[in-house]
């Protein structure tokens, strides 16, 4: 009944243009939070694992055929993570889920960077192959860490829920459009820059950069992102207007 009433009120409410939303102090801050959430969602580096796992595994010594076959493990981790996420977002506060996600990803990617730095790079030879001295567990360790990373990301995703709850009714259309647009632009950028990054800088630097970005995202969730779960949509709008005016 609440959603029916909210939908009725939104239909009757004047819709703001992007210019109106941007020129009003409190709604501009909400737009910026939405944009940042969308961008950080892609800057987790999740698509580097979903799109390029065979390339990553090949870079640590797996054969091309095995690299493609082992990609199924991240798919399994993604499915389990998505299922777990349904329970997580219903059980915990939105901010807490976001903090869990970013903290977990920061740890996973920092660990992955260290494995590349100390377990992979010292054994890589000039022709791109690896010394027989490289511990046999290292490639499998990379696979396990990437699978954990994918699981954490999929089980802790709250961005799409925030998109539906964060924006007041009068700017929900333009707010969602702008935030989602920025999300997909960032998706394209990360997808395009990852191959040359790992080729030129190596896995340690590449994933070190993504870990640092996720640490910034963690601070953003802790310091900036408001809670929305325990309030109605009207209460969220009233609270945000008071906070950001």
Regions found by a protein language model. Give the residues of each.
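Alpha-helical transmembrane bundle of multi-pass membrane proteins
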Residues: 4-245
């Amino acid at each position: 009944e609440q959603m029916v009433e909210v939908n009725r009120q939104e239909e009757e409410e004047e819709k703001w243009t992007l210019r109106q939303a941007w020129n009003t102090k409190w709604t501009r801050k909400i737009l910026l939070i939405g944009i940042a959430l969308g961008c950080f969602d892609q800057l987790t580096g999740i698509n580097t694992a979903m799109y390029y796992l065979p390339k990553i595994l090949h870079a640590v010594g797996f054969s091309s055929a095995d690299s493609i076959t082992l990609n199924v493990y991240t798919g399994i981790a993604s499915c389990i993570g998505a299922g777990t996420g349904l329970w997580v977002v219903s059980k915990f506060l939105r901010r807490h889920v976001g903090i869990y996600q970013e903290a977990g990803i920061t740890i996973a990617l920092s660990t992955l960077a260290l494995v590349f730095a100390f377990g992979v790079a010292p054994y890589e030879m000039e022709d791109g192959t690896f010394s027989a001295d490289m511990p046999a567990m290292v490639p499998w360790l990379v696979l396990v860490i990437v699978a954990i990373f994918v699981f954490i990301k999929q089980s802790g995703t709250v961005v799409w829920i925030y998109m539906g709850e964060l924006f007041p009714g009068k700017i929900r259309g333009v707010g969602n459009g702008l935030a989602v647009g920025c999300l997909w632009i960032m998706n394209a950028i990360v997808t395009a820059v990852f191959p040359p990054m790992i080729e030129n800088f190596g896995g340690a630097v590449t994933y070190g950069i993504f870990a640092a970005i996720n640490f910034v995202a963690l601070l953003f969730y802790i310091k900036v992102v408001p809670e929305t779960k325990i309030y109605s949509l009207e209460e969220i709008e009233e609270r945000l207007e008071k906070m950001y005016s």
